[in-house]
Amino acid sequence: MIKSFKPMLVATALSLATLAPVALAAEEQFFPIPSYRVGPYGANGQSFYGGFIDYLTYVNMKDKGVNGVTLTYEECETEYNNAKGVECYERLKGKAAKSSGPVHTMSTGISYALIDKSAQDKLPLAMMGYGRTDAVDGSVFPYAFPLVTTYQMQASAIVKFIKEKLGGNLAGKKIVYLYHDSAYGKEAIIAMEAEASLNKFTLVPIPVAHPGNEQGAQWLKIRQEKPDFVVFWGWGVMNQTALKAAQKVGFPRERMIGSWWTGSEEDVIPAGDAAKGYMAATWNVAGKDVPLIADIEKVVYGGGKGNLQDKSKIGTILYNRGVSAAVLSVEAIRKAQEKYGKGKAMTGEQVRWAMENLNITDARLKQIGATNLLPEIKTSCDNHEGSGKVKIQQWDGAKWVPVSDWIEGNKALIHPLFQASAKQYAKEKGITPRDCSKEM
C-alpha cells in the first residue's frame, strides 16, 4: 500500500502542476481601438485616446482590472480616414472574437461605415457624441450606441441656451449654422430646422469644405447676414480658422457657440486672443479638479505608465472626454459581468446587453471619483443615448469655464426625428425592429 501510494502522490502533484497555470491565468478583456494620432485631426486623437487608454491602465493598476479581469487593447492608425478605419476594424475584430469592449472610432464617417459590419460581427459600436444619431433607436440598431448625447439633442440644447440669452423669445431672430461639410456637420441640420420652425427664427446654413482652412467667403456672408448668433459645427483646423475669421470681420465671439468638437484647448489656444469669450457645448468638463483625473495622474503617470508624451494634455477637454468614454465602457464590462459571470471576460454580445442596460447614477460617478465629469446615463432598448444633456462653457483666454448647468435638448421634438429615420432605415434594409417591451 505504501509503495503504491508514493507514485500516486507524484502523479497527482504533476497533474496539479500542469493545471495550475491554466487555473491561475488572469482572464483578459480586449479593447479594439481604431484610433488616429496623425493627420489633420491627430492632435485631437492624441488627447482623446490618451485619456481612454490611461483609464484602462488605471483600472488595471488600481483595481487589478474588473473583478480580476485584466483590460487589454490594441490600436490601429486610421488617420481619420473612412477606408483606413474599416481596414483597422477588420484587422482588429479577429482578436475581439472571444472578448470585446466597445469599439470607439471617434469618427462619424468611420462609424457610418461600420454600422452594418459591427452588427453582423456582434461587436458593440460606441459613438459618444458623434456617429449615426438615429441609432438612438435600439430596436433597429441593437449594436450601435450614440451614448450620452447626440448632435441633434446638442443643437436643441444650444438653441435653448441662446433663447434664454436673448430674453426667452427667438421669433424674428436670425441664427447662422456654420458647419463642416461632411456627415458630421450635416447631422444637426434637421434639428436646427425643427427648432427654427418651432421658435420662428430664421436659419441660415453655411457649409465649409474640408479641412476648413479657407473661410473668407463664408465669413463675408455672415457679415452680410448680421445674425444674432452663429452656431458653429467645426472640426480640427477649421475651428481656429473660424475664430480668427470672426475677429477679422468684427463678429463677437460671445455670440458664437460651437459643438463639443469645436470646444477643446486644441481649438482655442492656437487662435490666441481671437478665441476669448467664445462658447461651446460639452458633455464632459475640463480640469484636474475632478478627483478621478487627479488620481489617474498620480497613479498612472506616477507609476511611469502614462500613454501621453505631452502630460500638459492631462485634464484638457478631449483628454477628459477619452477618460469619460473609457469609464462608460468599463462600467459596461462591469454590468455585463453582473449578469454573465464576475471575473470572466465578456463577449461583444454580452457587452452589448450591458450597454443597453446602463444605469450610471451620480452616486456611482461619485464612487468612481467622476462627480460632474459627465451627466448621469440610463439606457434602454429604445434609448441608446441615455442622457441628452450638455453644458455650455466659455473660454476666458486661459481655461474653459462652465456658464450653465446641464441642459437637456427638446426630447419631444428631437427623438421622433430619430425614430422616423430609423424606421426608414429598417424599411430600406429589410430589418424587423425588435419589440423593446420584451427586452430585459
Where are these regions (language model features)?
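Bacterial N-terminal signal peptides
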Residues: 11-19
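Sec/Tat signal peptide C-region and signal peptidase I cleavage site
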Residues: 19-25
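Beta-alpha junction/loop-to-helix N-cap segments that form part of ligand/metal-binding clefts
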Residues: 28-30, 43-50, 61-138, 147, ...
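Extracytoplasmic "Venus flytrap"
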Residues: 28-53, 76-83, 107, 178-187, ...
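Extracellular/periplasmic Venus flytrap/periplasmic-binding protein
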Residues: 84, 133-134, 142-249, 287-294
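Periplasmic-binding protein-like
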Residues: 92-107, 124-128, 174-179, 205, ...
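Extracellular/periplasmic periplasmic-binding protein-like sensory domains
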Residues: 246-326, 421, 433
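Segments of small-molecule ligand-sensing domains
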Residues: 307-319, 330-405, 409
